[in-house]
């Protein structure tokens, strides 16, 4: 596969996650919005294109696989993503879903939509060699960003994620965060360590260890 394109991202972009109707209503009126909004289409299966017109910030669209924290939906994930792809700045597709969502991945490239390839493990943090292999697969697939979220319950887990971020920054853009006990500190620490994106739900955390948008904005100079 060809080398990934360099999609322009701020040094560390703050992503506000919209995964509920009330968050969708909140977003347009925010005085200090995040750099991007992530639309969790698996939580918003009835979303209409007209509702996006009020969102001023660039959009990441995601229809998360149930095995990686997504919500089961009646509509095919592929159809949801293709519907909103023309309005997106980025699309997020799990590494495990590259074959299933191949048409989405290819269409994103055709439309010059940035491609985030992601991996989530909310039970543990895999060994460094496992994470490195997944990064290589994402890079081979042409991802603009490789996103990793794993459960970190001790300092060793946090260090594993930091080492991945620090050692691989030269090879491609990375978004690295933790869930669990060390989730909150990872969102502060990894921002300064080089993570391209840091996510925060506008109101409702989806996983243990997430900081809401207001909690994150209240820390330092986010």
What are these model-derived regions, one by one?
Residues 32-35, 54-58, 86-89, 111-113, ...:
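Short glycine/proline-enriched coil/turn segments at helix->beta-strand junctions
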């Amino acid at each position: 596969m060809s080398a990934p394109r360099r999609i322009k991202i701020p040094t560390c972009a703050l992503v506000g996650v919209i995964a509920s109707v009330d968050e969708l209503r909140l977003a347009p009126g925010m005085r200090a919005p995040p750099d991007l909004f992530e639309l969790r289409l698996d939580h918003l299966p009835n979303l209409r294109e007209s509702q996006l017109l009020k969102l001023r910030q660039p959009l990441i669209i995601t229809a998360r696989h149930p095995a990686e924290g997504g919500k089961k939906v009646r509509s095919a994930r592929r159809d949801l993503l293709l519907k909103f792809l023309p309005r997106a700045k980025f699309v997020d597709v799990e590494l495990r879903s590259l074959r299933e969502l191949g048409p989405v991945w290819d269409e994103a490239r055709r439309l010059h939509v940035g491609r985030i390839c992601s991996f989530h493990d909310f039970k543990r943090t895999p060994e460094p060699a496992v994470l490195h292999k997944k990064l290589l697969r994402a890079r081979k697939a042409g991802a603009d960003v490789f996103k990793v979220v794993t459960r970190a319950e001790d300092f060793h887990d946090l260090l594993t994620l930091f080492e991945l971020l620090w050692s691989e920054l030269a090879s491609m853009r990375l978004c690295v965060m933790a869930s669990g006990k060390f989730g909150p500190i990872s969102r502060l620490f990894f921002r300064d360590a080089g993570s391209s994106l840091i996510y925060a739900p506008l109101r409702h955390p989806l996983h243990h260890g997430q900081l809401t948008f207001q909690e994150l904005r209240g820390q330092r100079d986010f």
